[in-house]
Amino acid sequence: MDHGFYPTNLEGEGLRIGIVQARFNEPVCEALREACVAELEQLGVAGEDVLLVTVPGALEVPLALQKMAESGQFDALIALGAVIRGETYHFELVSNESGAGITRVCLDFNIAIANGILTTDTDAQAHARTREKGRDCARTAIEMANLTAALDGLQDHGQDDENE
């Protein structure tokens, strides 16, 4: 059986990327951002095509993402932050609600969002994951921006032409 295949496309040239970074657990979040921005540049995204905004914490990230999505100015968005377990239920609340909010914005506004909000048990775990997670978010945002653009062009794929 023959089938179509869309290969992974990590070409970032010409893409506009919005980044929302939480400031809570700032050293971790800054390391995430540095790795993410470096990878975006490595993959061809121009500095002037990246907009970074910061918010107090992970729970504020979805609203900023929503405002960016509403603008229609971005091909993909990236959420960066760190939620580190403490001694209360707050960890679960922040982790679950920020993740659900990010997913809702993604689906409501039909825009790719790379979720780089780390959820770890310790500071050491968070620091150990910053570099790879930051780079992964850049790659995910670019890949999904290119994929969604390609899929937008598939409106009639697989449908028989009624005029034949």
From Swiss-Prot:
Record-listed 5-amino-6-(D-ribitylamino)uracil binding positions: 24, 58-60, 82-84, 115
CDD domains documented for this protein: Lumazine_synthase-I
GO biological process: riboflavin biosynthetic process
Superkingdom in the source lineage: Bacteria
Residues at the active site: 90
Entry keywords, A to Z: Riboflavin biosynthesis, Transferase
Root EC class: transferase
GO CC aspect terms: cytosol; riboflavin synthase complex
Function: Catalyzes the formation of 6,7-dimethyl-8-ribityllumazine by condensation of 5-amino-6-(D-ribitylamino)uracil with 3,4-dihydroxy-2-butanone 4-phosphate. This is the penultimate step in the biosynthesis of riboflavin.
EC number(s) on file: 2.5.1.78
Gene Ontology molecular function, alphabetical: 6,7-dimethyl-8-ribityllumazine synthase activity
Metabolic or biological pathway, per its Swiss-Prot or TrEMBL entry: Cofactor biosynthesis; riboflavin biosynthesis; riboflavin from 2-hydroxy-3-oxobutyl phosphate and 5-amino-6-(D-ribitylamino)uracil: step 1/2
InterPro entries (UniProt xref): LS, LS/RS, LS/RS_sf
Swiss-Prot/TrEMBL catalytic activity: (2S)-2-hydroxy-3-oxobutyl phosphate + 5-amino-6-(D-ribitylamino)uracil = 6,7-dimethyl-8-(1-D-ribityl)lumazine + phosphate + 2 H2O + H(+)
Similarity comment: family membership: Belongs to the DMRL synthase family.
PANTHER family in the cross-refs: 6,7-DIMETHYL-8-RIBITYLLUMAZINE SYNTHASE, 6,7-DIMETHYL-8-RIBITYLLUMAZINE SYNTHASE DMRL SYNTHASE LUMAZINE SYNTHASE
UniProt name for this protein: 6,7-dimethyl-8-ribityllumazine synthase
Chain sites annotated for binding (2S)-2-hydroxy-3-oxobutyl phosphate: 87-88, 129
